[in-house]
């Protein structure tokens, strides 16, 4: 409400005086702010506290406010004093509003000028709520009511449309009608008297002109008229009916009867009372009834409210009916219905035997005026003889809103009998009428009209009338508001009858619907006929077996907006079936009529037996629901029922879900619409009163409701075993007597809770007991039905899926391997259309025959508590078959079929481990007992090779189970032997963990689009490059396959540099199954490996320049896959321009501005724009003399890697490893990897990090003979080399991941180290790797002969001198790992870091500007 505070007065002032002060504050200039209203409230508190009395105008004048303390409050008091002085003095003392006469109403300050007008703004919902809250306890039309609205209007300057919206929000329908009538009359009178300033009749009505943006004073005049119309509202606090409220124990019927009596006695003639009853039946109802009526709304018809509150009423009360059910017609004159006795004591004298209207204590004074019906001043309206005679005819029927002259005097008894009752069906409230008149179409003399007792006038569609019928526009107030352009008044009478033979009545005023949507028979027709409407009483039987308390938590407590999913159309057959199903649910009390929001579609589904099943599609509601976790993970395994308690009985609960009631606040989400055939009648809406099937939380809520009674009965019979799942319950008892007692106690307990036990489904031993689709025998468990598998080729995809679903259900008792099932599963691939036709192969048909034979032996033994659990793992190429059994049992406990792993190759040892773990989980969950022994069909040599040679970390898990694992050779007794009808062949090449001397060596490598291999045995036998598709990994696989095809069938040592290919080869040679439909290249690789009697698989680090033969041959294979251009070389490695200078053709200068290193976009984006100064650090005098170590971090995708970097201070050779964790163990692992590739250092210099200073790391360095020292971190004079190396490596990684976002971290780091160590050239035109592996310094004696010089020239700096000018060039006499011996006099050894190769004088320049790449 803008800057206005709450209209509720603070302590110490009456409401009228507070409103006077607020209105005076509106005249302040500038306009009042929130601080002004706060000062005004503080002033009232101060006055009440200091003066010890309430504030009034006489006691709180302008002088009562201390100056300067309460802001502009003195100006407000002065304004109030000025206005009241001009109006003739101060008002009198205010009296409370609720006090009745003879007290005078409180004096209110007259409407004053509002000063400067506020800018117009539309109402916000929060403002409308605040206004309604302020006036909800004030009488409509009262002075305080008007004053409150006046202050709200001053704040927003509303247009006529805004005022109409305000009226609809704060007023009841009857008040809205009265206000609109009074406002229309006031506007017409003002326009006729020409008292409106600025009004021009030629430009439109006052409503139209005041809605313009520049209306100004004209809008103020409209607002004043709107407020003046509010003073004439019919309801006043003094009206007797406004003070009638429903008692806490009073039924809704008695409360409505009291309202009707009060309105009949006191309401003026001509004022409709139905809207007042509709409004007050909700507003003055008690809290419990208001909660029931919240979904229907406060302005719903009173009949709907009484039906909704019928259950709340006491049981000895009769439900209220505004209509009566006609009885059988009797000959002779019609007798009035007997007077019904009162249902309870009179609320006036609290005595029984008479109605409240006949109470002797009721005041019987003379009436204040003549009777409005017969104009007789001697009696009240309720005692009018005319009304009593009319009531005798109507007998409790529909009351007319206006006085109508009786027409029964001219009718015979037979005609009167026809008029007295209009029978209507509850589901179809329509009646046939016969019309005649000059304005009707000739074909519209008979029609079907909808009876609506809420409509005051009859409504006809416009297409029933001729085109030029006389009309007058009409404004109609309906449920959606005021409609001004849709309806017209028909200016001419029409004749109407309910039977062809009459009698006919004349209707003078009829509404015409121009949209041709409605044909309604209003209250005017039954009133003129003096007839009643008879509707058969709705039969609502109680819900049999509903729990006392509904669940308070069903997952919808957050009360989201209910879904509005439209009902889709149905054909006539399904619609009739749906109507029958809804009718049955309605009779059973599971559903009830619904008028609130929300909708989910419904449809029927035909069962196999021809019956129909009701389906409610609650997917939209389930999407809004928070799932409640179920108490049971799934159906129990019936083999877990031990054989010891032999006496079993099972029972089933009938319509179990329908016994759980649902609170009314959740019924919005469980509603649906029943469509009418052809849409000729209004649809009907219903909502569930109980938990429906299809609701996501219905199973969990039902389990929670049944959990406690089952626990109580189970505790009382502790020797019996209870098994339950949803509405199926089974009891196993040691004796027959205890079984009978347990059943009686459980059935009685369930009936007390309201559940129905289906006696026809109760069964017990000695006959087999059906339970959860299975049959429980004395020793075994079978399935009630087995699939027949009458399958022929071709077959549709839908039929094959159904067959596989049936097989999955009975698979735990079917003695078969995974192979025939896998054949059927493979036929489902690449088919998505359910109508697709599948051709089965002969092998698949043979698998179906095997399954059909296995189904004939489908059975499982029950668990014997005295015997241990044993397990068998049967490995096949299609998957694993797992068997859980006990010794001496006829059948196993269960069969389990598991597929291969998701990888291309599934190792046999891993499959055995996964099978054992799965069986252990099933044994513990079903029988709460671990497995004693595992048996398998895997060859012992293959299992030993996998355990000894596999690098899989899960080998440790299999070693923990090793004492319990036994091979198949022991042949233990058990039903699993039926599986060994065909022994599985385990083919694997002989694996050798160590290289085979004098054997053939195969090296392979790959690049994008090609692969290569070479064969070597004492000398190079064969080498070749072959084309390959797509990636480098597939290229290396193609090279390996070509090499294996070219190699003779003899032992071979295979060396690859791909980690993936290395892992795949080791998996295959150690024993593994490929996928049932393997990649052709993998299948060919497996067959090629089987050609060789012995195989060794080795991994060589890619791009290694080590001097051993393996690295040399691997480099030879790399040379078979050269890159064609220097641009491709730089795109792969992002090397510096010096490295490109080694490219043979074309030659590229290191300082060429057109070099690929200079033109590369990635390098231009990521290269630093400048470099820091080189600092002096402690360097080694030889390779592996002093190392520096550091840990840096690099983020790739969602992981942050710790890079453990080790740098040789002499050569700059670097090794780095990426680790996920940052522990001392990972640091030691990184150091070991660096020692493997670079050698062992003598000294290691690190920072003072926790990983390097830990006792474990220090002890490790001592054991390896490495001297450990520390430096200050991030210090350029002590840690500059490793910090610079960290930056170079991370720069290269960033470039690679910018070009290839999905490049694995290991490959990116390997490429970065290769580029940094072996490709990028230092200023001396040597790589770091060459410098690290160059020969040591030659020993030259002092008196020896000076070596001869070479052709190489070098520029040099002398060590220890401050002059940074390059000297030379001079030839190098000797080149060694530490430096070069220059031909000075005498010769001087100069380290490589102070040397620079000299090529041409004209090229000597600032080379750093041209070498900004990954190695500055």
Swiss-Prot record:
Gag polyprotein: Late-budding domains (L domains) are short sequence motifs essential for viral particle release. They can occur individually or in close proximity within structural proteins. They interacts with sorting cellular proteins of the multivesicular body (MVB) pathway. Most of these proteins are class E vacuolar protein sorting factors belonging to ESCRT-I, ESCRT-II or ESCRT-III complexes. Matrix protein p15 contains one L domain: a PPXY motif which binds to the WW domains of the ubiquitin ligase NEDD4. One of its GO terms (biological process) is DNA recombination. Keywords: Capsid protein, DNA integration, DNA recombination, DNA-binding, Endonuclease, Host-virus interaction, Hydrolase, Lipoprotein, Magnesium, Metal-binding, Multifunctional enzyme, Myristate, Nuclease, Nucleotidyltransferase, Phosphoprotein, Repeat, RNA-directed DNA polymerase, Transferase, Viral budding, Viral budding via the host ESCRT complexes, Viral genome integration, Viral matrix protein, Viral nucleoprotein, Viral release from host cell, Virion, Virus entry into host cell, Zinc, Zinc-finger. Mg(2+) 1 binds at residues 652, 727-728. This is Gag-Pro-Pol polyprotein. It catalyses: DNA(n) + a 2'-deoxyribonucleoside 5'-triphosphate = DNA(n+1) + diphosphate; Endonucleolytic cleavage to 5'-phosphomonoester. It comes from Bovine leukemia virus (isolate Japanese BLV-1). Gag-Pro polyprotein: The matrix domain targets Gag, Gag-Pro and Gag-Pro-Pol polyproteins to the plasma membrane via a multipartite membrane binding signal, that includes its myristoylated N-terminus. GO terms for molecular function: aspartic-type endopeptidase activity; DNA binding; DNA-directed DNA polymerase activity; RNA stem-loop binding; RNA-directed DNA polymerase activity; RNA-DNA hybrid ribonuclease activity; structural constituent of virion; zinc ion binding. Residues 586-776 form the Reverse transcriptase domain. Residues 1179-1343 form the Integrase catalytic domain. PANTHER family: ENDOGENOUS RETROVIRUS GROUP K MEMBER POL PROTEIN, RNA-DIRECTED DNA POLYMERASE-RELATED. Residues 447-525 form the Peptidase A2 domain. Its cofactor is Mg(2+). The record marks 109-110, 322-323, 419-420, 544-545, 1120-1121 as: Cleavage. The RT polymerase active site binds 2 magnesium ions. Pfam families: Gag_p19, Gag_p24, Gag_p24_C, IN_DBD_C, RNase_H, rve, RVP, RVT_1. Mg(2+) 3 binds at residues 1190, 1247. Residues 996-1126 form the RNase H type-1 domain. GO terms for cellular component: viral nucleocapsid. A motif (PPXY motif) lies at residues 100-103.
């Amino acid at each position: 409400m803008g800057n206005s505070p709450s209209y509720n007065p603070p302590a110490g002032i009456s409401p009228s005086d507070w409103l006077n002060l607020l209105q005076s504050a509106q005249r302040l200039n500038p306009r009042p702010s929130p601080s002004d209203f706060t000062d005004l409230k503080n002033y009232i508190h101060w006055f009440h506290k200091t003066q010890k009395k309430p504030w009034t105008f006489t006691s709180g004048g302008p002088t009562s406010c201390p100056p300067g303390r309460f802001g502009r409050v003195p100006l407000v008091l002065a304004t109030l004093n000025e206005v009241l002085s001009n109006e003739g003095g101060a008002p009198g003392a205010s009296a409370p509003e609720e006090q009745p006469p003879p007290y005078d109403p409180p004096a209110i300050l007259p409407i004053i000028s509002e000063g400067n007008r506020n800018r117009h703004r539309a109402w916000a919902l929060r403002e409308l709520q605040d206004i309604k809250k302020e006036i909800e306890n004030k009488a409509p039309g009262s002075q305080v009511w008007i004053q409150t609205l006046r202050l709200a209007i001053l704040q927003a300057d509303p247009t006529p449309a805004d005022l109409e919206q305000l009226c609809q929000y704060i007023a009841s329908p009857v008040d809205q009608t009265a206000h609109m009538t009074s406002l229309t009359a006031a506007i017409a009178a003002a326009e006729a008297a020409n008292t409106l300033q600025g009004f021009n009749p030629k430009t439109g009505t006052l409503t139209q002109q005041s809605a313009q943006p520049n209306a100004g004073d004209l809008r103020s005049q409209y607002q004043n008229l709107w407020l003046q119309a509010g003073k004439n509202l019919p309801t006043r606090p003094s009206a007797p009916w406004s003070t009638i409220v429903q008692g806490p124990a009073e039924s809704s019927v008695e409360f409505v009867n009291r309202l009707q009596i009060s309105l009949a006695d006191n309401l003026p003639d001509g004022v409709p009372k139905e809207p007042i009853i509709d409004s007050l039946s909700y507003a003055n109802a008690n809290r419990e009834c208001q909660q029931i009526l919240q979904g229907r709304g406060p302005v719903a018809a009173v009949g709907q409210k009484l039906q909704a509150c019928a259950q709340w009423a006491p049981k000895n009360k009769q439900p209220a009916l505004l209509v009566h059910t006609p009885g059988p017609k009797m000959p002779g004159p019609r007798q009035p219905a007997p007077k019904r006795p009162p249902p309870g004591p009179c609320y006036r004298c609290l005595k029984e035997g008479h109605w409240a209207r006949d109470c002797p204590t009721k005041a019987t004074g003379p009436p204040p005026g003549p009777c409005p019906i017969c104009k007789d001043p001697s009696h009240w309206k309720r005692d009018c003889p005319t009304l009593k005679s009319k009531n005798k005819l109507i007998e409790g029927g529909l009351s007319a809103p206006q006085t109508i002259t009786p027409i029964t005097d001219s009718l015979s008894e037979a005609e009167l009998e026809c008029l007295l009752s209009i029978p209507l069906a509850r589901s179809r409230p329509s009646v046939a009428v016969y019309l005649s008149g000059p304005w009707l179409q000739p074909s519209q003399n008979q029609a079907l009209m909808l009876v609506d007792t809420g409509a005051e006038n009859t409504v006809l569609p416009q297409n029933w009338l001729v085109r030029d019928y006389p009309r007058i526009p009409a404004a109609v107030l309906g449920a959606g508001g005021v409609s001004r352009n849709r309806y017209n008044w028909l200016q001419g009478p029409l004749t109407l009858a309910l039977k062809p033979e009459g009698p006919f009545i004349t209707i003078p005023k009829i509404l015409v619907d121009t949209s041709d949507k409605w044909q309604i028979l209003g209250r005017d027709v039954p009133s003129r006929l003096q007839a009643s409407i008879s509707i058969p009483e709705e039969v609502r039987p109680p819900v049999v077996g509903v729990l006392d308390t509904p669940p308070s938590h069903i997952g919808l407590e957050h009360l989201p907006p209910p879904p509005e999913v439209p009902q889709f159309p149905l054909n006539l057959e399904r619609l009739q079936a749906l109507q029958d199903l809804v009718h049955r649910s309605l009779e059973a009390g599971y559903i009830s009529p619904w008028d609130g929001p929300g909708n989910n579609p419904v449809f029927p589904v035909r069962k196999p037996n021809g019956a129909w099943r009701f389906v409610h599609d609650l997917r939209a509601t389930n999407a809004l629901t928070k799932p409640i976790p179920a108490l049971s993970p799934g159906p129990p395994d019936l083999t877990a029922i031990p054989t010891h308690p032999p006496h079993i009985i099972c029972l089933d609960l009938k319509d179990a879900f329908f016994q759980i009631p649902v609170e009314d606040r959740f019924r919005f989400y469980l509603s649906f619409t029943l469509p009418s055939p052809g849409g000729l009648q209004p649809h009907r809406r219903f909502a569930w009163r109980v938990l429906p099937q299809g609701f996501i939380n219905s199973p969990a809520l039902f389990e929670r409701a049944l959990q406690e009674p089952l626990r109580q009965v189970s505790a009382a019979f502790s020797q019996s075993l209870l098994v339950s799942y949803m509405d199926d319950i089974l009891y196993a008892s040691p004796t027959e007597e205890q079984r009978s007692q347990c059943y009686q106690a459980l059935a009685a307990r369930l009936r007390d809770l309201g559940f129905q036990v289906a006696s026809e489904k109760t069964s017990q031993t000695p006959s087999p007991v059906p339970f959860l689709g299975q049959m429980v025998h004395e020793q075994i468990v079978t399935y009630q039905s087995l699939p027949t598998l009458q399958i022929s080729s071709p077959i549709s995809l839908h039929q094959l899926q159904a067959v596989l679903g049936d097989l999955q259900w009975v698979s735990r008792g079917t003695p078969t391997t995974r192979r025939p099932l896998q054949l059927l599963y493979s036929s489902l691939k690449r088919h998505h259309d359910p109508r697709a036709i599948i051709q089965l192969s002969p092998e698949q048909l043979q698998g179906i025959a095997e399954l059909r034979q296995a189904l004939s032996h489908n059975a499982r033994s029950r668990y014997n508590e005295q015997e241990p659990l044993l397990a068998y793992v049967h490995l096949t190429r299609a998957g694993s078959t797992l068997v859980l059994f006990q010794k001496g049992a006829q059948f196993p406990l269960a069969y389990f079929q598991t597929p291969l792993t998701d990888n291309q190759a599934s190792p046999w040892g891993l499959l055995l481990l996964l099978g054992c773990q799965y069986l252990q989980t099933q044994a513990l969950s079903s029988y709460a007992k671990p497995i004693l022994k595992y048996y398998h069909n895997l060859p012992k040599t293959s299992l030993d090779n996998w355990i000894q040679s596999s690098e899989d970390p899960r080998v440790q898990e299999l070693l923990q189970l090793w004492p319990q694992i036994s091979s198949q050779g022991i042949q233990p007794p058990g039903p699993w032997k039926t599986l060994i009808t065909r022994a599985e062949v385990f083919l694997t090449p002989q694996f050798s963990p160590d290289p085979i001397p004098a054997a053939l060596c195969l090296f392979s490598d790959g690049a994008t689009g090609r692969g290569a291999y070479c064969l070597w045995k004492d000398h190079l036998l064969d080498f070749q490059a072959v084309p390959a598709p797509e990636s480098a990994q597939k290229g290396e696989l193609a090279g390996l396959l070509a090499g294996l095809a070219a190699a003779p069938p003899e032992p071979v040592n295979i060396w690859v540099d791909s980690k993936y290919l290395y892992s795949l080869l080791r998996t295959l040679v150690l024993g593994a199954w490929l996928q049932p439909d393997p990649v052709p290249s993998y299948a060919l690789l497996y067959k090629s490996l089987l050609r060789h009697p012995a195989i060794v698989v080795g991994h060589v680090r890619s791009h290694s320049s080590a001097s051993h033969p393996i690295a040399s041959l691997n480099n030879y294979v790399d040379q078979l896959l050269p890159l064609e251009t220097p641009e491709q070389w730089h795109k792969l490695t992002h090397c510096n321009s010096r490295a490109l200078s080694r490219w043979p053709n074309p030659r590229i200068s290191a300082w060429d501005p057109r070099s690929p290193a200079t033109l590369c976009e990635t390098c231009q984006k990521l290269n630093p724009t400048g470099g820091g100064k080189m600092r002096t650090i402690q360097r080694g005098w030889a390779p592996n003399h002093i190392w520096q170590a550091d840990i840096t971090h690099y983020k790739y995708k969602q992981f942050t890697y710790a890079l453990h970097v080790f740098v040789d201070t002499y050569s700059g050779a670097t090794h780095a490893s990426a680790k996920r964790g940052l522990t001392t163990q990972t640091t030691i692992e990184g150091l070991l990897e660096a020692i493997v590739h670079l050698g062992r250092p003598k000294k290691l210099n690190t920072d003072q990090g926790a990983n390097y200073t830990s006792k474990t790391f220090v002890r490790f360095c001592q054991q390896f003979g490495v001297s450990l020292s520390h430096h200050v971190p991030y210090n350029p004079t002590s840690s500059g080399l490793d910090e610079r190396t960290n930056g170079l490596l991370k720069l290269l990684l960033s470039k690679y991941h910018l070009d290839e976002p999905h490049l694995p971290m290991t490959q990116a780091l390997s490429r970065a180290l290769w580029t940094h160590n072996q490709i990028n050239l230092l200023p001396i035109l040597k790589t770091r790797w060459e410098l690290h592996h160059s020969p040591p310094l030659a020993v030259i004696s002092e008196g020896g002969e000076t070596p001869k010089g070479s052709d190489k020239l070098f520029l040099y700096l002398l060590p220890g001198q401050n002059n940074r000018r390059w000297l030379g060039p001079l030839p190098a006499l000797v080149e060694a790992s530490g430096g070069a011996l220059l031909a000075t006099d005498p010769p001087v050894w100069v380290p490589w870091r102070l040397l620079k190769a000299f090529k041409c004088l004209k090229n000597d320049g600032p080379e750093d500007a041209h070498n900004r790449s990954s190695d500055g």
